[in-house]
Amino acid sequence: MNIYDRIKTMSDEMAGDLTAQRRDFHKYAEPGWFEMRTSSIIARKLTELGYEVLVGDQVCKKDSRMGVPSEEKLEEQYERAVAQGADPEFVKYTKGGMTGVIGILRCGEGPTVAMRFDIDALGVFEEHDPSHRPAKEGFNSVNEGFMHACGHDGHATIGLGVAKVLMSIKDQLHGTVKLIFQPAEEGVRGAKSIVDNGHLDGVDYMIGSHVTNKKEDDPAVVIPGSYGSLAMTKYDVIFHGKSAHAGGSPEVGRNVMLAVGTAILNLYAIPRHSGGVSRVNVGTVVAGSGRNVIADEAKMEIEVRGETTEINEYMKNYAVNIIESAAKMHGCTCEMKLMGAANSLASSEALMERVKRVCEEDLHLPVAKEMSSKNGGSEDVSYMMNRVQEQGGQATFMRVLTHEAGPGHSRIFDIDEQVLPNAVKIFCGVVYDIMH
Protein backbone atom coordinates (compact mmCIF):
# COMPACT_ATOMS: atom_id res chain seq x y z
CA MET A 1 0.00 0.00 0.00
CA ASN A 2 1.50 3.35 -1.01
CA ILE A 3 1.32 6.41 1.24
CA TYR A 4 -1.61 7.99 -0.60
CA ASP A 5 -3.60 4.79 -0.17
CA ARG A 6 -2.68 4.78 3.52
CA ILE A 7 -3.96 8.33 3.83
CA LYS A 8 -7.23 7.44 2.13
CA THR A 9 -7.76 4.27 4.14
CA MET A 10 -7.00 5.88 7.47
CA SER A 11 -9.21 8.89 6.72
CA ASP A 12 -12.12 6.65 5.79
CA GLU A 13 -11.62 4.44 8.86
CA MET A 14 -11.80 7.46 11.18
CA ALA A 15 -14.98 8.85 9.55
CA GLY A 16 -17.11 7.79 12.52
CA ASP A 17 -14.75 9.40 15.01
CA LEU A 18 -14.64 12.58 12.93
CA THR A 19 -18.43 12.76 12.87
CA ALA A 20 -18.60 12.28 16.64
CA GLN A 21 -15.99 14.98 17.25
CA ARG A 22 -17.70 17.43 14.90
CA ARG A 23 -21.00 16.87 16.68
CA ASP A 24 -19.38 17.46 20.06
CA PHE A 25 -17.98 20.79 18.88
CA HIS A 26 -21.36 21.62 17.35
CA LYS A 27 -23.23 20.89 20.58
CA TYR A 28 -20.96 23.13 22.65
CA ALA A 29 -20.71 26.05 20.23
CA GLU A 30 -18.42 28.89 21.33
CA PRO A 31 -18.01 32.15 19.34
CA GLY A 32 -14.85 34.22 18.87
CA TRP A 33 -12.54 34.54 21.90
CA PHE A 34 -14.96 32.31 23.83
CA GLU A 35 -13.63 29.00 22.34
CA MET A 36 -12.30 27.85 25.71
CA ARG A 37 -13.74 24.35 25.88
CA THR A 38 -13.02 23.86 22.17
CA SER A 39 -9.39 24.97 22.44
CA SER A 40 -8.70 22.92 25.55
CA ILE A 41 -9.97 19.75 23.87
CA ILE A 42 -7.91 20.44 20.74
CA ALA A 43 -4.78 21.02 22.84
CA ARG A 44 -5.37 17.79 24.78
CA LYS A 45 -5.83 15.71 21.63
CA LEU A 46 -2.74 17.18 19.96
CA THR A 47 -0.71 16.47 23.08
CA GLU A 48 -1.91 12.87 23.20
CA LEU A 49 -0.92 12.45 19.54
CA GLY A 50 2.61 13.61 20.35
CA TYR A 51 2.62 17.15 18.95
CA GLU A 52 4.50 20.07 20.40
CA VAL A 53 1.58 22.25 21.52
CA LEU A 54 1.40 26.03 21.89
CA VAL A 55 -1.50 27.61 23.79
CA GLY A 56 -2.59 30.89 25.36
CA ASP A 57 -0.33 33.88 24.77
CA GLN A 58 2.14 31.62 22.94
CA VAL A 59 -0.31 31.68 20.01
CA CYS A 60 -2.08 35.05 19.82
CA LYS A 61 -0.43 38.40 20.45
CA LYS A 62 -2.75 39.83 23.08
CA ASP A 63 -2.77 43.44 21.89
CA SER A 64 -3.35 42.44 18.24
CA ARG A 65 -6.67 40.72 18.96
CA MET A 66 -9.72 42.60 17.72
CA GLY A 67 -13.29 42.69 18.95
CA VAL A 68 -12.49 41.06 22.29
CA PRO A 69 -15.50 40.79 24.66
CA SER A 70 -15.50 42.34 28.13
CA GLU A 71 -13.59 40.70 30.98
CA GLU A 72 -16.91 39.98 32.68
CA LYS A 73 -18.25 38.07 29.68
CA LEU A 74 -14.96 36.23 29.22
CA GLU A 75 -15.07 35.08 32.84
CA GLU A 76 -18.67 33.91 32.47
CA GLN A 77 -17.68 31.89 29.41
CA TYR A 78 -14.68 30.41 31.20
CA GLU A 79 -16.90 29.14 34.00
CA ARG A 80 -19.32 27.65 31.48
CA ALA A 81 -16.49 25.96 29.56
CA VAL A 82 -15.24 24.33 32.75
CA ALA A 83 -18.75 23.18 33.62
CA GLN A 84 -19.21 21.73 30.12
CA GLY A 85 -16.17 19.49 30.26
CA ALA A 86 -13.19 21.59 29.19
CA ASP A 87 -9.83 19.90 29.68
CA PRO A 88 -8.69 20.99 33.17
CA GLU A 89 -5.01 21.23 32.26
CA PHE A 90 -5.37 23.33 29.14
CA VAL A 91 -8.47 25.44 29.79
CA LYS A 92 -6.58 27.63 32.25
CA TYR A 93 -4.48 28.98 29.37
CA THR A 94 -7.63 30.27 27.63
CA LYS A 95 -8.51 32.73 30.41
CA GLY A 96 -9.13 36.21 29.08
CA GLY A 97 -9.91 34.92 25.60
CA MET A 98 -6.50 33.52 24.68
CA THR A 99 -8.04 30.67 22.71
CA GLY A 100 -5.65 29.85 19.88
CA VAL A 101 -3.84 26.51 19.63
CA ILE A 102 -0.91 25.46 17.43
CA GLY A 103 0.38 21.91 17.01
CA ILE A 104 3.91 21.47 15.65
CA LEU A 105 5.40 18.30 14.15
CA ARG A 106 9.13 18.48 13.44
CA CYS A 107 10.44 15.98 10.91
CA GLY A 108 14.00 17.13 10.30
CA GLU A 109 15.22 19.34 7.48
CA GLY A 110 12.78 20.46 4.82
CA PRO A 111 10.02 22.96 4.08
CA THR A 112 7.63 24.33 6.68
CA VAL A 113 3.94 23.80 5.88
CA ALA A 114 1.24 25.62 7.86
CA MET A 115 -2.45 24.83 7.80
CA ARG A 116 -5.20 27.02 9.26
CA PHE A 117 -8.40 25.64 10.83
CA ASP A 118 -10.82 28.20 12.27
CA ILE A 119 -12.76 27.06 15.33
CA ASP A 120 -15.32 29.70 16.31
CA ALA A 121 -19.11 29.66 16.20
CA LEU A 122 -21.56 32.48 15.48
CA GLY A 123 -24.07 34.46 17.52
CA VAL A 124 -27.02 32.60 15.99
CA PHE A 125 -29.98 30.88 17.68
CA GLU A 126 -30.08 27.31 16.37
CA GLU A 127 -33.33 25.78 15.12
CA HIS A 128 -34.95 23.35 17.58
CA ASP A 129 -37.51 21.86 15.19
CA PRO A 130 -36.94 18.12 14.50
CA SER A 131 -36.72 18.91 10.79
CA HIS A 132 -33.24 20.25 11.62
CA ARG A 133 -30.93 17.21 11.84
CA PRO A 134 -28.83 18.40 14.80
CA ALA A 135 -32.05 18.89 16.78
CA LYS A 136 -33.47 15.55 15.68
CA GLU A 137 -30.28 13.64 16.52
CA GLY A 138 -29.48 15.48 19.73
CA PHE A 139 -26.41 17.55 18.93
CA ASN A 140 -27.85 21.02 18.41
CA SER A 141 -26.19 23.77 20.44
CA VAL A 142 -26.85 23.76 24.18
CA ASN A 143 -25.38 27.27 24.37
CA GLU A 144 -28.42 29.36 23.51
CA GLY A 145 -27.64 32.12 21.04
CA PHE A 146 -24.42 30.49 19.83
CA MET A 147 -24.29 28.10 16.88
CA HIS A 148 -21.82 26.60 14.44
CA ALA A 149 -23.66 28.05 11.46
CA CYS A 150 -20.65 28.28 9.13
CA GLY A 151 -18.98 24.89 9.44
CA HIS A 152 -16.09 25.74 11.73
CA ASP A 153 -16.99 22.75 13.91
CA GLY A 154 -16.09 20.74 10.82
CA HIS A 155 -12.91 22.73 10.23
CA ALA A 156 -11.64 22.11 13.78
CA THR A 157 -12.46 18.41 13.40
CA ILE A 158 -10.67 18.22 10.04
CA GLY A 159 -7.59 19.71 11.69
CA LEU A 160 -7.57 17.00 14.34
CA GLY A 161 -8.01 14.33 11.67
CA VAL A 162 -5.08 15.77 9.73
CA ALA A 163 -3.00 15.74 12.92
CA LYS A 164 -3.65 12.04 13.46
CA VAL A 165 -2.88 10.98 9.88
CA LEU A 166 0.29 13.08 9.57
CA MET A 167 1.62 11.72 12.86
CA SER A 168 1.11 8.18 11.51
CA ILE A 169 3.26 8.93 8.44
CA LYS A 170 5.81 11.24 10.07
CA ASP A 171 8.68 8.92 9.10
CA GLN A 172 7.87 9.74 5.46
CA LEU A 173 7.96 13.52 5.99
CA HIS A 174 10.86 15.96 5.86
CA GLY A 175 10.36 19.42 7.31
CA THR A 176 7.97 21.01 9.81
CA VAL A 177 4.18 20.92 10.05
CA LYS A 178 2.26 23.69 11.81
CA LEU A 179 -1.43 23.09 12.52
CA ILE A 180 -2.97 26.46 13.41
CA PHE A 181 -6.34 26.35 15.16
CA GLN A 182 -7.50 29.95 14.89
CA PRO A 183 -10.06 31.68 17.08
CA ALA A 184 -12.36 34.53 16.04
CA GLU A 185 -12.44 34.22 12.26
CA GLU A 186 -16.04 35.46 12.27
CA GLY A 187 -15.76 39.22 12.24
CA VAL A 188 -12.17 38.77 10.93
CA ARG A 189 -10.72 39.34 14.37
CA GLY A 190 -8.23 36.57 15.10
CA ALA A 191 -5.71 35.80 12.35
CA LYS A 192 -3.69 39.00 12.61
CA SER A 193 -2.84 38.30 16.25
CA ILE A 194 -1.29 34.97 15.22
CA VAL A 195 0.66 36.54 12.35
CA ASP A 196 1.86 39.35 14.64
CA ASN A 197 3.25 36.72 17.01
CA GLY A 198 5.52 35.46 14.23
CA HIS A 199 3.94 32.07 13.55
CA LEU A 200 3.90 32.52 9.76
CA ASP A 201 7.49 33.75 9.59
CA GLY A 202 9.62 31.25 7.70
CA VAL A 203 6.62 29.27 6.45
CA ASP A 204 7.06 27.99 2.88
CA TYR A 205 3.52 26.74 2.21
CA MET A 206 0.24 27.87 3.74
CA ILE A 207 -3.04 25.98 3.21
CA GLY A 208 -6.49 26.95 4.44
CA SER A 209 -9.95 25.77 3.48
CA HIS A 210 -13.66 26.28 3.97
CA VAL A 211 -16.56 23.89 3.54
CA THR A 212 -18.67 25.10 0.61
CA ASN A 213 -22.02 24.04 -0.78
CA LYS A 214 -22.21 22.32 -4.16
CA LYS A 215 -24.95 21.26 -6.55
CA GLU A 216 -26.67 17.95 -5.83
CA ASP A 217 -25.24 16.17 -8.88
CA ASP A 218 -21.72 17.65 -8.71
CA PRO A 219 -19.13 14.89 -8.03
CA ALA A 220 -16.27 17.33 -7.30
CA VAL A 221 -14.90 17.43 -3.76
CA VAL A 222 -12.60 20.46 -3.94
CA ILE A 223 -11.89 23.78 -5.64
CA PRO A 224 -8.11 24.22 -5.29
CA GLY A 225 -8.07 27.97 -4.59
CA SER A 226 -9.84 31.27 -4.05
CA TYR A 227 -9.63 34.86 -5.19
CA GLY A 228 -11.59 38.08 -4.84
CA SER A 229 -11.92 38.15 -1.06
CA LEU A 230 -12.46 41.78 -0.15
CA ALA A 231 -10.08 43.53 2.20
CA MET A 232 -12.08 44.94 5.09
CA THR A 233 -11.90 47.14 8.19
CA LYS A 234 -14.56 47.32 10.92
CA TYR A 235 -14.95 50.02 13.55
CA ASP A 236 -17.16 50.71 16.53
CA VAL A 237 -17.47 54.50 16.83
CA ILE A 238 -18.56 56.28 20.01
CA PHE A 239 -19.58 59.94 19.69
CA HIS A 240 -19.54 62.06 22.86
CA GLY A 241 -21.50 65.31 23.13
CA LYS A 242 -23.27 67.26 25.87
CA SER A 243 -26.87 66.81 26.95
CA ALA A 244 -29.27 69.72 27.39
CA HIS A 245 -32.99 70.46 27.39
CA ALA A 246 -34.09 70.44 23.77
CA GLY A 247 -36.71 73.15 24.35
CA GLY A 248 -35.28 75.23 27.16
CA SER A 249 -31.58 75.52 26.28
CA PRO A 250 -30.64 73.61 23.12
CA GLU A 251 -27.65 75.90 22.49
CA VAL A 252 -25.99 74.56 25.62
CA GLY A 253 -25.91 71.04 24.25
CA ARG A 254 -23.60 69.35 21.80
CA ASN A 255 -25.84 67.09 19.73
CA VAL A 256 -24.31 63.77 18.74
CA MET A 257 -27.30 63.11 16.46
CA LEU A 258 -26.03 65.85 14.17
CA ALA A 259 -22.51 64.43 14.22
CA VAL A 260 -23.78 60.92 13.43
CA GLY A 261 -26.09 62.16 10.67
CA THR A 262 -23.33 64.19 9.05
CA ALA A 263 -20.96 61.23 9.24
CA ILE A 264 -23.45 58.79 7.71
CA LEU A 265 -24.34 61.00 4.76
CA ASN A 266 -20.71 61.68 3.95
CA LEU A 267 -19.56 58.08 4.43
CA TYR A 268 -21.93 57.03 1.68
CA ALA A 269 -20.60 59.89 -0.46
CA ILE A 270 -16.98 58.68 -0.47
CA PRO A 271 -15.84 58.82 -4.12
CA ARG A 272 -15.50 55.39 -5.74
CA HIS A 273 -12.02 54.13 -6.61
CA SER A 274 -10.96 53.50 -10.21
CA GLY A 275 -8.81 50.55 -9.14
CA GLY A 276 -11.71 48.26 -8.30
CA VAL A 277 -14.69 47.48 -6.10
CA SER A 278 -15.23 49.35 -2.83
CA ARG A 279 -17.87 49.13 -0.13
CA VAL A 280 -19.05 51.11 2.89
CA ASN A 281 -21.84 50.33 5.31
CA VAL A 282 -23.20 51.79 8.51
CA GLY A 283 -24.81 48.77 10.14
CA THR A 284 -26.15 50.10 13.43
CA VAL A 285 -26.68 53.38 15.26
CA VAL A 286 -27.79 53.60 18.88
CA ALA A 287 -28.33 57.06 20.35
CA GLY A 288 -30.58 59.25 22.47
CA SER A 289 -32.58 58.94 25.67
CA GLY A 290 -35.71 61.03 25.08
CA ARG A 291 -37.47 63.31 22.61
CA ASN A 292 -36.79 66.46 24.66
CA VAL A 293 -33.14 65.71 25.43
CA ILE A 294 -30.13 66.70 23.32
CA ALA A 295 -28.37 63.36 22.83
CA ASP A 296 -24.91 63.23 24.37
CA GLU A 297 -23.73 59.79 23.27
CA ALA A 298 -24.12 57.60 20.22
CA LYS A 299 -22.63 54.32 19.06
CA MET A 300 -22.23 53.55 15.37
CA GLU A 301 -20.94 50.31 13.81
CA ILE A 302 -19.37 50.67 10.37
CA GLU A 303 -17.29 48.72 7.90
CA VAL A 304 -15.42 49.51 4.70
CA ARG A 305 -14.17 47.03 2.10
CA GLY A 306 -12.01 47.10 -1.00
CA GLU A 307 -11.16 44.74 -3.84
CA THR A 308 -7.52 45.20 -2.91
CA THR A 309 -5.82 46.05 0.35
CA GLU A 310 -4.87 49.41 -1.16
CA ILE A 311 -8.48 50.28 -2.04
CA ASN A 312 -9.60 49.28 1.44
CA GLU A 313 -6.90 51.54 2.91
CA TYR A 314 -8.24 54.39 0.75
CA MET A 315 -11.77 53.76 2.05
CA LYS A 316 -10.60 53.45 5.65
CA ASN A 317 -8.61 56.69 5.62
CA TYR A 318 -11.51 58.55 4.00
CA ALA A 319 -13.97 57.15 6.56
CA VAL A 320 -11.80 58.04 9.57
CA ASN A 321 -11.40 61.61 8.30
CA ILE A 322 -15.16 61.97 7.77
CA ILE A 323 -16.06 60.65 11.22
CA GLU A 324 -13.53 62.79 13.06
CA SER A 325 -14.50 65.88 11.06
CA ALA A 326 -18.24 65.31 11.62
CA ALA A 327 -17.67 65.13 15.36
CA LYS A 328 -15.55 68.28 15.38
CA MET A 329 -18.03 70.16 13.17
CA HIS A 330 -20.76 69.77 15.80
CA GLY A 331 -18.62 70.33 18.87
CA CYS A 332 -18.43 66.65 19.76
CA THR A 333 -15.62 64.17 20.21
CA CYS A 334 -15.34 60.59 19.04
CA GLU A 335 -13.38 57.44 19.69
CA MET A 336 -12.93 54.64 17.17
CA LYS A 337 -12.26 51.04 18.17
CA LEU A 338 -10.93 48.63 15.56
CA MET A 339 -13.19 45.54 15.69
CA GLY A 340 -11.92 43.46 12.78
CA ALA A 341 -9.81 43.54 9.64
CA ALA A 342 -8.74 41.43 6.69
CA ASN A 343 -6.66 41.85 3.55
CA SER A 344 -7.51 40.76 0.02
CA LEU A 345 -6.24 37.34 -1.03
CA ALA A 346 -5.32 35.35 -4.11
CA SER A 347 -4.19 31.73 -4.14
CA SER A 348 -0.77 30.86 -5.59
CA GLU A 349 -1.06 29.25 -9.02
CA ALA A 350 1.63 26.64 -8.36
CA LEU A 351 0.01 25.44 -5.14
CA MET A 352 -3.43 25.27 -6.75
CA GLU A 353 -1.94 23.13 -9.51
CA ARG A 354 -0.36 20.88 -6.89
CA VAL A 355 -3.71 20.42 -5.12
CA LYS A 356 -5.36 19.53 -8.42
CA ARG A 357 -2.65 17.05 -9.40
CA VAL A 358 -2.52 15.30 -6.03
CA CYS A 359 -6.30 14.98 -5.84
CA GLU A 360 -6.74 13.67 -9.38
CA GLU A 361 -3.62 11.54 -9.85
CA ASP A 362 -2.79 10.29 -6.35
CA LEU A 363 -5.98 10.43 -4.27
CA HIS A 364 -8.33 9.84 -7.20
CA LEU A 365 -10.72 12.52 -5.99
CA PRO A 366 -12.69 14.62 -8.51
CA VAL A 367 -11.71 18.28 -8.73
CA ALA A 368 -13.97 21.14 -9.81
CA LYS A 369 -13.53 22.52 -13.32
CA GLU A 370 -12.68 25.97 -11.99
CA MET A 371 -9.27 26.23 -10.34
CA SER A 372 -10.26 29.14 -8.14
CA SER A 373 -13.52 30.30 -6.56
CA LYS A 374 -14.44 33.94 -6.08
CA ASN A 375 -14.98 34.82 -2.43
CA GLY A 376 -17.27 37.83 -2.27
CA GLY A 377 -16.93 38.31 1.48
CA SER A 378 -13.86 38.77 3.64
CA GLU A 379 -11.55 36.18 5.25
CA ASP A 380 -8.74 36.88 7.68
CA VAL A 381 -6.77 33.82 6.56
CA SER A 382 -5.61 36.50 4.11
CA TYR A 383 -3.18 37.79 6.74
CA MET A 384 -1.52 34.38 6.90
CA MET A 385 -1.53 33.84 3.14
CA ASN A 386 -0.14 37.29 2.40
CA ARG A 387 2.61 36.93 4.99
CA VAL A 388 3.77 33.66 3.43
CA GLN A 389 3.55 35.01 -0.12
CA GLU A 390 5.48 38.16 0.84
CA GLN A 391 8.33 35.86 1.94
CA GLY A 392 8.36 34.10 -1.42
CA GLY A 393 6.24 31.17 -0.27
CA GLN A 394 3.02 29.74 -1.68
CA ALA A 395 -0.49 29.83 -0.21
CA THR A 396 -3.99 28.72 -1.11
CA PHE A 397 -7.48 28.80 0.35
CA MET A 398 -9.32 25.71 -0.87
CA ARG A 399 -13.07 25.15 -1.07
CA VAL A 400 -13.91 21.69 0.21
CA LEU A 401 -17.25 20.84 -1.36
CA THR A 402 -20.22 19.36 0.45
CA HIS A 403 -24.00 19.39 0.51
CA GLU A 404 -25.24 21.93 3.04
CA ALA A 405 -28.65 22.23 4.67
CA GLY A 406 -29.68 25.87 4.83
CA PRO A 407 -27.61 28.91 3.91
CA GLY A 408 -24.48 29.78 5.84
CA HIS A 409 -25.02 31.83 9.01
CA SER A 410 -28.64 30.64 9.24
CA ARG A 411 -30.29 28.80 12.14
CA ILE A 412 -30.81 25.67 9.99
CA PHE A 413 -27.26 25.33 8.64
CA ASP A 414 -25.76 21.83 8.60
CA ILE A 415 -23.18 19.91 6.55
CA ASP A 416 -22.87 16.47 4.99
CA GLU A 417 -20.22 14.92 7.24
CA GLN A 418 -18.60 13.00 4.37
CA VAL A 419 -16.73 16.25 3.80
CA LEU A 420 -14.67 15.52 6.93
CA PRO A 421 -12.67 12.48 5.72
CA ASN A 422 -12.52 13.98 2.22
CA ALA A 423 -10.85 17.12 3.55
CA VAL A 424 -8.43 15.12 5.70
CA LYS A 425 -7.34 13.20 2.59
CA ILE A 426 -6.78 16.40 0.61
CA PHE A 427 -4.75 18.19 3.30
CA CYS A 428 -2.63 15.15 4.09
CA GLY A 429 -2.10 14.21 0.45
CA VAL A 430 -0.87 17.70 -0.43
CA VAL A 431 1.36 17.90 2.66
CA TYR A 432 2.91 14.52 1.86
CA ASP A 433 3.51 15.61 -1.75
CA ILE A 434 5.37 18.68 -0.48
CA MET A 435 7.32 17.04 2.33
CA HIS A 436 8.20 13.48 1.27
Protein language model features and the residues they cover:
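Sec/Tat-exported extracytoplasmic proteins
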Residues: R22, A29, G50, G198, ...
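Short Gly/Pro-enriched turn/cap motifs at secondary-structure boundaries
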Residues: F90-T94, E185, G225-S229, S372-G376
